[in-house]
Amino acid sequence: NEGGELGYSLSHAFGAVLDNPDLIAACVVGDGEAETGPLAASWHLNKIINPLTDGIVLPILHLNGYKIANPTIYSRIPEDELIKYFEGCGWNPYVVEASSTAKIHELMARTLDRCIEEIKIIKSKTRLNKRATFPMIILKTPKGWGGPKFINNLQVEGTFRSHQVPVVVNKEHPENLEILEAWLRSYKPEELFDKNGTLKKELKELAPKGNHRMGMNPHANGGLLLEELNIPDFRGYGVEVKNPGETISQDMMELGYFIRDIIRLNENKKNFRIFGPDEALSNRLNHVFEATNRQWNGIRYDNDEFISPYGRVIDSVLSEHLCEGMLEGYLLTGRHGFIHSYEAFIRIVDSMASQHAKWLKVTKDLPWRRDISSLNFILSSYVWQQDHNGFTHQDPGFLNHIVTKKADTVRIYLPPDTNTLISCFDHCIRSKNYINVIVASKHPRPQWLNMSDAIKHCTKGLGRWDFASNDEGCEPDLVMACAGETPTIEALAATKILRENFSDLKIRFINVVDLMKLQSHENHPHGLEDAEYDNLFTKDKPIIFAFHGYPNLIHELTYKRHNQNMHVHGYLEEGTITTTFDMKVQNKLDRYNLVIDALKYLDKLGDKSSALNEWCKNKLIEHKEYIKEYGEDMPEIKNWKW
Protein backbone atom coordinates (compact mmCIF):
# COMPACT_ATOMS: atom_id res chain seq x y z
CA ASN A 1 0.00 0.00 0.00
CA GLU A 2 1.44 3.34 -1.05
CA GLY A 3 -0.22 5.20 1.79
CA GLY A 4 -1.80 8.33 0.39
CA GLU A 5 -4.62 10.06 2.23
CA LEU A 6 -3.95 10.03 5.95
CA GLY A 7 -5.93 10.69 9.10
CA TYR A 8 -8.25 7.74 9.60
CA SER A 9 -6.18 4.98 11.17
CA LEU A 10 -7.38 5.59 14.73
CA SER A 11 -11.05 6.08 13.84
CA HIS A 12 -10.90 2.83 11.83
CA ALA A 13 -9.36 1.09 14.84
CA PHE A 14 -12.03 2.41 17.21
CA GLY A 15 -14.74 1.29 14.79
CA ALA A 16 -13.15 -2.16 14.67
CA VAL A 17 -13.26 -2.65 18.45
CA LEU A 18 -16.91 -1.58 18.86
CA ASP A 19 -18.89 -4.62 20.05
CA ASN A 20 -15.67 -6.69 20.00
CA PRO A 21 -14.92 -6.90 23.74
CA ASP A 22 -12.08 -9.42 23.31
CA LEU A 23 -10.28 -7.48 20.57
CA ILE A 24 -7.19 -5.31 20.98
CA ALA A 25 -6.46 -3.16 17.92
CA ALA A 26 -2.83 -2.03 17.83
CA CYS A 27 -2.84 1.07 15.63
CA VAL A 28 0.40 2.58 14.33
CA VAL A 29 0.08 6.34 13.81
CA GLY A 30 2.82 8.15 11.94
CA ASP A 31 3.80 11.53 13.34
CA GLY A 32 2.91 13.08 9.98
CA GLU A 33 -0.56 11.53 10.04
CA ALA A 34 -0.93 12.73 13.62
CA GLU A 35 -0.96 16.30 12.31
CA THR A 36 -4.15 15.79 10.26
CA GLY A 37 -7.43 17.10 11.64
CA PRO A 38 -9.25 13.75 11.79
CA LEU A 39 -6.37 12.03 13.56
CA ALA A 40 -5.92 14.88 16.02
CA ALA A 41 -9.60 14.56 16.98
CA SER A 42 -9.43 10.75 17.15
CA TRP A 43 -7.47 10.74 20.42
CA HIS A 44 -10.76 11.60 22.15
CA LEU A 45 -12.64 8.55 20.92
CA ASN A 46 -11.57 6.87 24.16
CA LYS A 47 -14.50 8.80 25.67
CA ILE A 48 -16.89 6.84 23.44
CA ILE A 49 -15.55 3.30 23.90
CA ASN A 50 -16.97 1.19 26.73
CA PRO A 51 -14.36 -1.35 27.90
CA LEU A 52 -17.11 -3.67 29.18
CA THR A 53 -18.80 -4.08 25.81
CA ASP A 54 -16.08 -3.00 23.36
CA GLY A 55 -12.47 -3.87 22.70
CA ILE A 56 -9.47 -1.65 23.32
CA VAL A 57 -7.37 0.41 20.92
CA LEU A 58 -3.63 0.51 21.61
CA PRO A 59 -2.23 3.50 19.69
CA ILE A 60 1.45 3.44 18.78
CA LEU A 61 2.53 6.96 17.86
CA HIS A 62 5.69 6.56 15.78
CA LEU A 63 7.88 9.65 16.09
CA ASN A 64 10.55 9.46 13.39
CA GLY A 65 10.77 13.21 13.13
CA TYR A 66 10.04 14.08 9.53
CA LYS A 67 7.47 14.23 6.77
CA ILE A 68 8.33 14.61 3.04
CA ALA A 69 10.50 17.69 3.54
CA ASN A 70 9.61 19.09 6.97
CA PRO A 71 10.01 18.16 10.61
CA THR A 72 6.93 16.87 12.41
CA ILE A 73 5.30 18.92 15.13
CA TYR A 74 5.02 16.13 17.70
CA SER A 75 8.72 15.26 17.37
CA ARG A 76 9.75 18.82 18.22
CA ILE A 77 7.67 19.05 21.39
CA PRO A 78 9.63 18.44 24.63
CA GLU A 79 8.93 14.96 25.94
CA ASP A 80 7.38 16.11 29.22
CA GLU A 81 5.01 18.40 27.31
CA LEU A 82 4.13 15.60 24.90
CA ILE A 83 3.33 13.23 27.77
CA LYS A 84 1.15 15.86 29.45
CA TYR A 85 -0.72 16.42 26.21
CA PHE A 86 -1.68 12.78 25.85
CA GLU A 87 -2.43 12.45 29.54
CA GLY A 88 -4.81 15.36 29.05
CA CYS A 89 -6.44 13.40 26.24
CA GLY A 90 -7.05 10.52 28.65
CA TRP A 91 -4.12 8.24 27.79
CA ASN A 92 -1.30 6.68 29.79
CA PRO A 93 1.73 7.11 27.49
CA TYR A 94 4.78 4.84 27.49
CA VAL A 95 7.86 6.19 25.69
CA VAL A 96 10.06 3.68 23.87
CA GLU A 97 13.45 4.94 22.66
CA ALA A 98 16.90 3.38 22.23
CA SER A 99 20.11 3.99 20.30
CA SER A 100 20.53 0.46 18.93
CA THR A 101 18.17 -1.69 16.88
CA ALA A 102 18.70 -4.66 19.18
CA LYS A 103 17.78 -2.63 22.24
CA ILE A 104 14.68 -1.09 20.64
CA HIS A 105 13.24 -4.55 19.92
CA GLU A 106 13.72 -5.59 23.52
CA LEU A 107 12.21 -2.40 24.91
CA MET A 108 9.28 -2.51 22.52
CA ALA A 109 8.47 -6.12 23.36
CA ARG A 110 8.61 -5.40 27.07
CA THR A 111 6.40 -2.32 26.71
CA LEU A 112 3.85 -4.18 24.60
CA ASP A 113 3.62 -6.87 27.28
CA ARG A 114 3.10 -4.21 29.92
CA CYS A 115 0.37 -2.50 27.88
CA ILE A 116 -1.46 -5.78 27.29
CA GLU A 117 -1.33 -6.55 31.01
CA GLU A 118 -2.69 -3.07 31.76
CA ILE A 119 -5.49 -3.53 29.24
CA LYS A 120 -6.46 -6.85 30.81
CA ILE A 121 -6.61 -5.21 34.23
CA ILE A 122 -8.80 -2.43 32.84
CA LYS A 123 -11.11 -4.99 31.25
CA SER A 124 -11.44 -6.96 34.47
CA LYS A 125 -11.86 -4.05 36.89
CA THR A 126 -13.75 -1.40 34.94
CA ARG A 127 -17.15 -0.52 36.28
CA LEU A 128 -20.02 0.66 34.14
CA ASN A 129 -19.96 4.28 35.26
CA LYS A 130 -16.23 4.95 35.43
CA ARG A 131 -14.04 5.79 32.43
CA ALA A 132 -10.67 4.07 32.30
CA THR A 133 -7.34 5.54 31.21
CA PHE A 134 -5.92 3.44 28.38
CA PRO A 135 -2.25 2.84 27.59
CA MET A 136 -0.54 4.11 24.46
CA ILE A 137 3.03 3.91 23.16
CA ILE A 138 5.18 6.74 21.86
CA LEU A 139 7.89 5.07 19.77
CA LYS A 140 10.89 7.24 18.93
CA THR A 141 13.23 6.10 16.15
CA PRO A 142 15.31 7.97 13.54
CA LYS A 143 13.66 8.29 10.14
CA GLY A 144 15.18 5.81 7.70
CA TRP A 145 16.84 3.90 10.52
CA GLY A 146 19.02 1.13 9.10
CA GLY A 147 19.21 2.74 5.67
CA PRO A 148 22.16 4.56 4.08
CA LYS A 149 23.60 7.16 6.43
CA PHE A 150 24.88 9.42 3.64
CA ILE A 151 24.27 9.70 -0.10
CA ASN A 152 26.23 12.21 -2.18
CA ASN A 153 27.69 13.66 1.01
CA LEU A 154 24.23 14.49 2.36
CA GLN A 155 22.90 12.91 5.55
CA VAL A 156 19.98 10.59 4.82
CA GLU A 157 19.35 8.48 7.92
CA GLY A 158 17.63 10.56 10.56
CA THR A 159 16.54 13.26 8.11
CA PHE A 160 13.67 14.02 5.74
CA ARG A 161 15.80 12.73 2.84
CA SER A 162 15.03 9.14 3.84
CA HIS A 163 11.33 9.63 3.03
CA GLN A 164 9.84 7.31 0.37
CA VAL A 165 12.68 6.42 -2.08
CA PRO A 166 15.98 7.53 -0.54
CA VAL A 167 18.20 5.84 -3.17
CA VAL A 168 17.46 6.31 -6.85
CA VAL A 169 18.96 3.54 -8.98
CA ASN A 170 18.38 3.83 -12.73
CA LYS A 171 20.36 4.38 -15.91
CA GLU A 172 20.91 8.03 -14.96
CA HIS A 173 22.28 7.05 -11.54
CA PRO A 174 24.09 3.71 -11.88
CA GLU A 175 26.61 4.79 -9.25
CA ASN A 176 23.95 4.31 -6.56
CA LEU A 177 23.74 0.58 -7.19
CA GLU A 178 26.60 -0.07 -4.78
CA ILE A 179 24.86 1.97 -2.08
CA LEU A 180 21.63 0.00 -2.58
CA GLU A 181 23.45 -3.34 -2.51
CA ALA A 182 25.34 -2.43 0.66
CA TRP A 183 22.08 -1.40 2.29
CA LEU A 184 20.34 -4.67 1.40
CA ARG A 185 23.36 -6.76 2.45
CA SER A 186 23.33 -5.06 5.84
CA TYR A 187 20.33 -7.23 6.69
CA LYS A 188 22.56 -10.33 6.30
CA PRO A 189 20.32 -12.32 3.96
CA GLU A 190 22.74 -15.25 4.15
CA GLU A 191 21.65 -15.70 7.78
CA LEU A 192 17.96 -15.57 6.87
CA PHE A 193 17.64 -17.70 3.72
CA ASP A 194 19.07 -21.02 2.56
CA LYS A 195 20.83 -21.55 -0.77
CA ASN A 196 17.45 -21.90 -2.51
CA GLY A 197 16.28 -18.50 -1.28
CA THR A 198 13.82 -20.02 1.19
CA LEU A 199 13.39 -18.66 4.69
CA LYS A 200 15.29 -20.88 7.13
CA LYS A 201 13.23 -23.37 9.08
CA GLU A 202 14.19 -22.10 12.53
CA LEU A 203 13.03 -18.62 11.57
CA LYS A 204 9.78 -19.93 10.11
CA GLU A 205 9.07 -21.57 13.45
CA LEU A 206 9.13 -18.17 15.12
CA ALA A 207 6.22 -16.91 13.03
CA PRO A 208 2.66 -17.04 14.41
CA LYS A 209 0.45 -19.86 13.19
CA GLY A 210 -3.07 -19.93 11.75
CA ASN A 211 -5.34 -17.03 12.62
CA HIS A 212 -2.63 -15.53 14.82
CA ARG A 213 -0.96 -14.35 11.62
CA MET A 214 -1.86 -10.73 10.97
CA GLY A 215 -3.26 -11.32 7.50
CA MET A 216 -5.29 -14.35 8.62
CA ASN A 217 -6.99 -12.63 11.54
CA PRO A 218 -10.68 -12.80 10.54
CA HIS A 219 -11.15 -9.19 11.68
CA ALA A 220 -8.86 -8.22 8.79
CA ASN A 221 -11.25 -9.92 6.35
CA GLY A 222 -14.52 -8.90 7.94
CA GLY A 223 -16.73 -10.80 5.53
CA LEU A 224 -15.62 -13.99 7.31
CA LEU A 225 -17.39 -12.72 10.44
CA LEU A 226 -20.42 -11.18 8.73
CA GLU A 227 -23.80 -12.27 10.11
CA GLU A 228 -26.95 -11.21 8.30
CA LEU A 229 -29.17 -8.75 10.12
CA ASN A 230 -32.54 -9.74 11.48
CA ILE A 231 -34.76 -7.28 9.62
CA PRO A 232 -38.52 -6.94 10.16
CA ASP A 233 -40.85 -6.81 7.18
CA PHE A 234 -40.53 -3.19 6.10
CA ARG A 235 -44.01 -3.25 4.58
CA GLY A 236 -45.43 -3.07 8.09
CA TYR A 237 -43.89 0.37 8.63
CA GLY A 238 -45.48 2.22 5.74
CA VAL A 239 -47.94 5.06 6.05
CA GLU A 240 -51.45 4.66 4.69
CA VAL A 241 -52.01 6.51 1.42
CA LYS A 242 -55.55 6.23 0.06
CA ASN A 243 -55.26 9.04 -2.47
CA PRO A 244 -52.06 10.73 -3.67
CA GLY A 245 -51.21 13.83 -1.65
CA GLU A 246 -53.89 13.47 1.05
CA THR A 247 -51.69 11.99 3.78
CA ILE A 248 -49.04 14.18 5.44
CA SER A 249 -46.02 12.47 6.99
CA GLN A 250 -42.39 13.05 7.99
CA ASP A 251 -40.26 10.63 6.00
CA MET A 252 -37.25 10.42 8.33
CA MET A 253 -39.45 10.28 11.42
CA GLU A 254 -41.32 7.28 10.03
CA LEU A 255 -38.07 5.59 8.97
CA GLY A 256 -37.00 5.83 12.61
CA TYR A 257 -39.63 3.25 13.63
CA PHE A 258 -38.16 0.73 11.18
CA ILE A 259 -34.58 1.37 12.31
CA ARG A 260 -35.67 1.18 15.96
CA ASP A 261 -36.92 -2.36 15.44
CA ILE A 262 -33.81 -3.40 13.51
CA ILE A 263 -31.87 -2.37 16.63
CA ARG A 264 -34.18 -4.40 18.86
CA LEU A 265 -34.04 -7.52 16.69
CA ASN A 266 -30.24 -7.49 16.62
CA GLU A 267 -29.56 -6.62 20.24
CA ASN A 268 -28.14 -10.08 20.91
CA LYS A 269 -25.96 -10.08 17.78
CA LYS A 270 -24.74 -6.54 18.47
CA ASN A 271 -23.83 -6.02 14.83
CA PHE A 272 -25.76 -2.90 13.82
CA ARG A 273 -24.98 0.73 14.63
CA ILE A 274 -26.00 4.25 13.65
CA PHE A 275 -23.31 6.90 13.16
CA GLY A 276 -23.80 10.65 12.84
CA PRO A 277 -22.25 13.95 13.98
CA ASP A 278 -24.72 15.05 16.70
CA GLU A 279 -27.67 14.99 14.30
CA ALA A 280 -29.90 11.99 15.12
CA LEU A 281 -32.66 14.17 16.55
CA SER A 282 -32.16 16.96 14.04
CA ASN A 283 -32.50 14.43 11.22
CA ARG A 284 -35.66 13.13 12.92
CA LEU A 285 -34.46 9.66 13.90
CA ASN A 286 -36.17 10.27 17.24
CA HIS A 287 -37.80 6.86 17.52
CA VAL A 288 -34.50 4.95 17.63
CA PHE A 289 -34.11 6.27 21.18
CA GLU A 290 -37.09 4.17 22.21
CA ALA A 291 -34.76 1.19 21.79
CA THR A 292 -31.27 2.48 22.59
CA ASN A 293 -29.10 5.44 23.64
CA ARG A 294 -26.13 7.39 22.48
CA GLN A 295 -22.94 5.70 23.62
CA TRP A 296 -20.90 8.04 25.80
CA ASN A 297 -18.21 7.18 28.33
CA GLY A 298 -17.43 10.68 29.54
CA ILE A 299 -18.89 12.60 32.47
CA ARG A 300 -22.70 12.65 32.44
CA TYR A 301 -25.12 15.20 33.89
CA ASP A 302 -28.72 14.68 34.96
CA ASN A 303 -30.09 16.87 32.16
CA ASP A 304 -28.26 14.97 29.40
CA GLU A 305 -30.64 13.22 27.02
CA PHE A 306 -30.31 9.65 25.72
CA ILE A 307 -26.69 9.45 26.99
CA SER A 308 -25.41 6.13 28.33
CA PRO A 309 -22.16 4.13 28.60
CA TYR A 310 -23.76 1.69 26.16
CA GLY A 311 -25.87 2.49 23.12
CA ARG A 312 -26.23 1.62 19.46
CA VAL A 313 -25.97 5.26 18.35
CA ILE A 314 -22.56 6.89 17.91
CA ASP A 315 -23.79 10.46 17.83
CA SER A 316 -21.89 12.32 20.53
CA VAL A 317 -18.78 13.39 18.63
CA LEU A 318 -19.18 16.36 16.30
CA SER A 319 -16.97 15.14 13.48
CA GLU A 320 -18.12 13.74 10.16
CA HIS A 321 -14.59 12.40 9.72
CA LEU A 322 -14.69 10.37 12.92
CA CYS A 323 -18.23 9.07 12.38
CA GLU A 324 -17.36 7.98 8.85
CA GLY A 325 -14.05 6.47 9.98
CA MET A 326 -15.65 4.48 12.80
CA LEU A 327 -18.39 3.24 10.46
CA GLU A 328 -15.79 2.10 7.93
CA GLY A 329 -13.87 0.27 10.67
CA TYR A 330 -17.13 -1.30 11.85
CA LEU A 331 -18.04 -2.48 8.33
CA LEU A 332 -14.54 -3.71 7.51
CA THR A 333 -14.68 -5.99 10.56
CA GLY A 334 -17.92 -7.61 9.50
CA ARG A 335 -20.81 -5.57 10.84
CA HIS A 336 -23.63 -3.34 9.51
CA GLY A 337 -24.58 0.31 9.86
CA PHE A 338 -25.10 3.67 8.24
CA ILE A 339 -24.10 7.28 8.62
CA HIS A 340 -26.64 10.09 8.46
CA SER A 341 -25.65 13.70 7.99
CA TYR A 342 -26.75 17.12 6.91
CA GLU A 343 -26.50 17.02 3.13
CA ALA A 344 -24.12 19.98 2.88
CA PHE A 345 -21.70 18.71 5.49
CA ILE A 346 -21.30 15.18 4.17
CA ARG A 347 -18.98 16.95 1.72
CA ILE A 348 -16.45 16.92 4.57
CA VAL A 349 -15.92 13.19 3.92
CA ASP A 350 -15.89 13.33 0.11
CA SER A 351 -12.39 11.95 -0.07
CA MET A 352 -13.07 9.27 2.54
CA ALA A 353 -15.91 7.97 0.37
CA SER A 354 -13.50 8.02 -2.58
CA GLN A 355 -10.92 5.95 -0.73
CA HIS A 356 -13.56 3.40 0.31
CA ALA A 357 -14.76 3.21 -3.30
CA LYS A 358 -11.19 2.50 -4.42
CA TRP A 359 -10.89 -0.22 -1.77
CA LEU A 360 -14.14 -1.83 -2.96
CA LYS A 361 -12.96 -1.71 -6.57
CA VAL A 362 -9.73 -3.53 -5.77
CA THR A 363 -11.37 -6.13 -3.53
CA LYS A 364 -13.73 -7.19 -6.31
CA ASP A 365 -10.67 -8.70 -8.03
CA LEU A 366 -9.53 -10.61 -4.92
CA PRO A 367 -11.33 -13.96 -4.66
CA TRP A 368 -10.23 -14.48 -1.05
CA ARG A 369 -11.72 -11.18 0.11
CA ARG A 370 -15.23 -11.84 1.46
CA ASP A 371 -18.16 -9.49 0.91
CA ILE A 372 -18.87 -6.83 3.51
CA SER A 373 -21.97 -4.79 4.20
CA SER A 374 -22.39 -1.68 2.07
CA LEU A 375 -21.36 1.79 3.15
CA ASN A 376 -24.72 3.55 3.49
CA PHE A 377 -25.25 7.32 3.60
CA ILE A 378 -28.54 9.02 4.48
CA LEU A 379 -28.47 12.73 3.64
CA SER A 380 -31.16 14.87 5.22
CA SER A 381 -31.58 18.47 6.44
CA TYR A 382 -31.01 19.27 2.83
CA VAL A 383 -30.80 22.22 0.50
CA TRP A 384 -34.50 22.94 -0.08
CA GLN A 385 -35.60 23.60 3.51
CA GLN A 386 -33.18 24.92 6.09
CA ASP A 387 -35.51 26.65 8.56
CA HIS A 388 -33.15 28.88 10.61
CA ASN A 389 -30.05 27.91 8.61
CA GLY A 390 -29.02 29.41 5.31
CA PHE A 391 -26.61 29.49 2.40
CA THR A 392 -23.80 27.73 4.28
CA HIS A 393 -26.05 24.69 4.74
CA GLN A 394 -26.96 24.33 1.06
CA ASP A 395 -24.84 22.00 -1.05
CA PRO A 396 -26.18 18.90 -2.85
CA GLY A 397 -22.83 18.25 -4.55
CA PHE A 398 -22.11 14.92 -2.84
CA LEU A 399 -24.24 13.33 -5.57
CA ASN A 400 -21.97 14.75 -8.28
CA HIS A 401 -18.96 13.42 -6.41
CA ILE A 402 -20.32 9.90 -5.93
CA VAL A 403 -21.45 9.56 -9.55
CA THR A 404 -17.81 9.71 -10.69
CA LYS A 405 -16.97 6.43 -8.94
CA LYS A 406 -17.08 2.99 -10.52
CA ALA A 407 -20.53 2.04 -11.76
CA ASP A 408 -20.42 -1.37 -10.08
CA THR A 409 -19.83 0.32 -6.73
CA VAL A 410 -22.13 3.35 -6.31
CA ARG A 411 -25.90 3.77 -6.09
CA ILE A 412 -27.97 6.94 -5.51
CA TYR A 413 -31.61 6.98 -4.38
CA LEU A 414 -33.98 9.97 -4.16
CA PRO A 415 -37.22 8.65 -2.59
CA PRO A 416 -40.10 11.14 -2.97
CA ASP A 417 -42.03 10.07 0.14
CA THR A 418 -42.08 7.90 3.26
CA ASN A 419 -42.94 4.53 1.73
CA THR A 420 -40.32 4.82 -1.00
CA LEU A 421 -37.74 5.85 1.62
CA ILE A 422 -38.46 2.82 3.80
CA SER A 423 -38.31 0.53 0.76
CA CYS A 424 -34.99 2.06 -0.35
CA PHE A 425 -33.47 1.76 3.13
CA ASP A 426 -34.47 -1.90 3.41
CA HIS A 427 -32.76 -2.57 0.08
CA CYS A 428 -29.58 -0.68 0.99
CA ILE A 429 -29.10 -2.13 4.47
CA ARG A 430 -29.25 -5.67 3.02
CA SER A 431 -26.77 -4.99 0.21
CA LYS A 432 -23.06 -5.84 0.04
CA ASN A 433 -20.01 -4.12 -1.43
CA TYR A 434 -21.74 -0.91 -2.49
CA ILE A 435 -21.73 2.73 -1.55
CA ASN A 436 -25.40 3.67 -1.27
CA VAL A 437 -26.57 7.27 -0.96
CA ILE A 438 -30.15 8.08 0.05
CA VAL A 439 -31.41 11.68 0.08
CA ALA A 440 -34.44 11.98 2.37
CA SER A 441 -36.82 14.64 3.66
CA LYS A 442 -37.35 15.24 7.37
CA HIS A 443 -40.22 17.77 7.21
CA PRO A 444 -43.98 17.10 7.01
CA ARG A 445 -44.75 16.41 3.36
CA PRO A 446 -47.58 15.03 1.18
CA GLN A 447 -47.42 11.29 0.55
CA TRP A 448 -47.88 9.96 -2.97
CA LEU A 449 -47.63 6.16 -3.07
CA ASN A 450 -49.06 3.41 -0.89
CA MET A 451 -46.57 0.75 0.13
CA SER A 452 -47.50 -1.67 -2.63
CA ASP A 453 -47.01 0.99 -5.31
CA ALA A 454 -43.86 2.26 -3.60
CA ILE A 455 -42.27 -1.20 -3.76
CA LYS A 456 -43.06 -1.50 -7.45
CA HIS A 457 -41.75 1.99 -8.12
CA CYS A 458 -38.50 1.43 -6.21
CA THR A 459 -37.99 -1.95 -7.86
CA LYS A 460 -38.22 -0.34 -11.29
CA GLY A 461 -36.18 2.65 -10.11
CA LEU A 462 -38.29 5.13 -12.08
CA GLY A 463 -41.62 5.23 -13.81
CA ARG A 464 -44.70 7.02 -15.07
CA TRP A 465 -47.09 8.11 -12.35
CA ASP A 466 -50.53 7.33 -13.72
CA PHE A 467 -52.40 9.63 -11.36
CA ALA A 468 -50.42 12.65 -12.63
CA SER A 469 -50.33 11.70 -16.33
CA ASN A 470 -52.98 12.05 -19.04
CA ASP A 471 -51.19 10.65 -22.09
CA GLU A 472 -52.88 7.24 -22.09
CA GLY A 473 -52.57 5.60 -25.48
CA CYS A 474 -50.77 8.47 -27.19
CA GLU A 475 -47.50 10.36 -27.40
CA PRO A 476 -47.24 13.13 -24.79
CA ASP A 477 -46.80 16.77 -25.71
CA LEU A 478 -44.57 17.21 -22.68
CA VAL A 479 -42.63 14.97 -20.30
CA MET A 480 -42.55 16.34 -16.76
CA ALA A 481 -39.82 14.47 -14.87
CA CYS A 482 -38.52 14.81 -11.33
CA ALA A 483 -36.07 13.31 -8.86
CA GLY A 484 -36.21 14.16 -5.17
CA GLU A 485 -38.96 14.96 -2.67
CA THR A 486 -39.09 18.74 -3.19
CA PRO A 487 -38.81 18.61 -7.01
CA THR A 488 -41.64 16.06 -7.02
CA ILE A 489 -44.01 18.48 -5.27
CA GLU A 490 -43.13 21.35 -7.60
CA ALA A 491 -43.32 19.19 -10.73
CA LEU A 492 -46.77 17.96 -9.68
CA ALA A 493 -47.91 21.51 -8.96
CA ALA A 494 -46.64 22.65 -12.37
CA THR A 495 -48.41 19.73 -14.04
CA LYS A 496 -51.64 20.66 -12.30
CA ILE A 497 -51.38 24.28 -13.48
CA LEU A 498 -50.75 23.22 -17.08
CA ARG A 499 -53.59 20.71 -17.14
CA GLU A 500 -56.06 23.14 -15.56
CA ASN A 501 -55.25 25.72 -18.22
CA PHE A 502 -54.95 23.38 -21.23
CA SER A 503 -57.20 20.35 -20.91
CA ASP A 504 -56.06 18.91 -24.23
CA LEU A 505 -52.36 19.10 -23.33
CA LYS A 506 -50.92 15.59 -22.94
CA ILE A 507 -48.40 15.34 -20.11
CA ARG A 508 -46.43 12.29 -19.05
CA PHE A 509 -45.26 12.53 -15.44
CA ILE A 510 -42.12 10.55 -14.58
CA ASN A 511 -40.57 10.18 -11.15
CA VAL A 512 -37.00 8.91 -10.70
CA VAL A 513 -35.93 7.16 -7.49
CA ASP A 514 -32.78 5.38 -8.69
CA LEU A 515 -30.73 8.14 -10.31
CA MET A 516 -28.48 5.68 -12.11
CA LYS A 517 -31.43 4.54 -14.23
CA LEU A 518 -30.86 7.67 -16.32
CA GLN A 519 -27.41 6.55 -17.41
CA SER A 520 -26.89 4.37 -20.43
CA HIS A 521 -26.89 0.66 -19.68
CA GLU A 522 -23.45 0.60 -21.27
CA ASN A 523 -22.15 2.81 -18.47
CA HIS A 524 -24.04 1.52 -15.44
CA PRO A 525 -25.69 -1.84 -14.67
CA HIS A 526 -28.83 -0.04 -13.43
CA GLY A 527 -29.11 2.08 -16.56
CA LEU A 528 -32.11 1.64 -18.83
CA GLU A 529 -31.61 0.16 -22.27
CA ASP A 530 -32.03 2.79 -24.97
CA ALA A 531 -35.35 1.34 -26.12
CA GLU A 532 -36.76 1.43 -22.57
CA TYR A 533 -35.56 4.98 -22.05
CA ASP A 534 -36.98 6.18 -25.37
CA ASN A 535 -40.29 4.48 -24.66
CA LEU A 536 -40.54 6.39 -21.40
CA PHE A 537 -38.95 9.76 -22.18
CA THR A 538 -39.66 9.72 -25.96
CA LYS A 539 -37.06 10.46 -28.60
CA ASP A 540 -37.84 14.12 -29.15
CA LYS A 541 -40.59 15.52 -26.91
CA PRO A 542 -39.59 18.35 -24.55
CA ILE A 543 -38.59 17.19 -21.07
CA ILE A 544 -38.82 19.52 -18.10
CA PHE A 545 -36.75 17.86 -15.36
CA ALA A 546 -37.04 19.09 -11.77
CA PHE A 547 -33.98 17.81 -9.91
CA HIS A 548 -32.87 17.85 -6.29
CA GLY A 549 -29.25 18.77 -7.01
CA TYR A 550 -27.12 20.61 -9.53
CA PRO A 551 -28.71 20.54 -13.04
CA ASN A 552 -25.46 19.57 -14.77
CA LEU A 553 -25.62 16.12 -13.16
CA ILE A 554 -28.79 15.19 -15.08
CA HIS A 555 -27.23 16.41 -18.32
CA GLU A 556 -24.13 14.35 -17.56
CA LEU A 557 -26.12 11.19 -16.88
CA THR A 558 -28.28 11.54 -20.00
CA TYR A 559 -25.78 12.87 -22.53
CA LYS A 560 -25.78 9.61 -24.52
CA ARG A 561 -29.57 9.44 -24.76
CA HIS A 562 -31.40 10.17 -28.01
CA ASN A 563 -33.66 12.83 -26.55
CA GLN A 564 -31.54 15.89 -25.82
CA ASN A 565 -34.59 18.15 -25.63
CA MET A 566 -33.94 18.19 -21.88
CA HIS A 567 -34.38 21.28 -19.70
CA VAL A 568 -33.24 20.74 -16.13
CA HIS A 569 -34.15 22.85 -13.10
CA GLY A 570 -32.19 22.34 -9.90
CA TYR A 571 -29.93 24.06 -7.41
CA LEU A 572 -28.22 27.12 -8.91
CA GLU A 573 -26.14 28.08 -5.87
CA GLU A 574 -28.69 30.67 -4.77
CA GLY A 575 -29.82 30.73 -1.17
CA THR A 576 -30.16 32.43 2.17
CA ILE A 577 -32.28 32.14 5.31
CA THR A 578 -35.70 32.44 3.70
CA THR A 579 -39.00 30.63 3.25
CA THR A 580 -39.17 27.14 1.83
CA PHE A 581 -40.87 28.21 -1.37
CA ASP A 582 -38.55 31.17 -1.85
CA MET A 583 -35.57 28.79 -1.94
CA LYS A 584 -37.21 27.12 -4.92
CA VAL A 585 -38.00 30.45 -6.56
CA GLN A 586 -34.44 31.70 -6.16
CA ASN A 587 -33.22 28.59 -7.98
CA LYS A 588 -36.07 28.49 -10.53
CA LEU A 589 -37.25 25.09 -9.27
CA ASP A 590 -40.67 26.42 -8.30
CA ARG A 591 -43.90 25.48 -10.11
CA TYR A 592 -44.21 28.86 -11.82
CA ASN A 593 -40.75 28.77 -13.36
CA LEU A 594 -41.32 25.16 -14.42
CA VAL A 595 -44.51 26.20 -16.21
CA ILE A 596 -42.84 29.22 -17.83
CA ASP A 597 -40.05 27.00 -19.14
CA ALA A 598 -42.48 24.32 -20.36
CA LEU A 599 -44.48 26.88 -22.34
CA LYS A 600 -41.37 27.78 -24.36
CA TYR A 601 -41.32 24.31 -25.92
CA LEU A 602 -45.05 23.69 -26.41
CA ASP A 603 -45.40 24.99 -29.95
CA LYS A 604 -48.92 23.57 -30.30
CA LEU A 605 -50.23 26.13 -27.82
CA GLY A 606 -49.20 29.09 -29.96
CA ASP A 607 -50.45 32.41 -28.59
CA LYS A 608 -52.64 30.63 -26.05
CA SER A 609 -49.63 30.26 -23.76
CA SER A 610 -49.12 34.02 -23.35
CA ALA A 611 -51.78 34.52 -20.70
CA LEU A 612 -50.52 31.68 -18.52
CA ASN A 613 -46.95 32.84 -18.96
CA GLU A 614 -47.92 36.30 -17.73
CA TRP A 615 -49.95 34.85 -14.86
CA CYS A 616 -46.93 32.85 -13.64
CA LYS A 617 -44.68 35.91 -13.77
CA ASN A 618 -47.21 37.88 -11.77
CA LYS A 619 -47.40 35.06 -9.22
CA LEU A 620 -43.64 35.27 -8.73
CA ILE A 621 -43.92 39.03 -8.11
CA GLU A 622 -46.81 38.43 -5.72
CA HIS A 623 -44.75 35.83 -3.89
CA LYS A 624 -41.86 38.24 -3.35
CA GLU A 625 -44.14 40.96 -2.03
CA TYR A 626 -45.98 38.55 0.27
CA ILE A 627 -42.92 37.06 1.96
CA LYS A 628 -41.46 40.55 2.37
CA GLU A 629 -44.57 41.66 4.24
CA TYR A 630 -45.50 38.50 6.17
CA GLY A 631 -42.27 36.50 6.40
CA GLU A 632 -43.96 33.29 5.29
CA ASP A 633 -45.18 31.67 2.09
CA MET A 634 -48.54 32.51 0.53
CA PRO A 635 -51.49 30.40 1.76
CA GLU A 636 -52.00 28.91 -1.71
CA ILE A 637 -48.45 27.56 -1.50
CA LYS A 638 -48.60 26.37 2.11
CA ASN A 639 -52.01 24.76 1.65
CA TRP A 640 -51.55 23.41 -1.87
CA LYS A 641 -53.10 20.03 -2.61
CA TRP A 642 -52.83 17.77 -5.62
Segments (PLM) and residue ranges:
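Thiamine diphosphate
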Residues: 1-26, 35, 41-450, ...
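Gly/Ser/Thr-rich loops at beta-strand to alpha-helix junctions
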Residues: 33-35, 142-145, 278-282, 319-320, ...
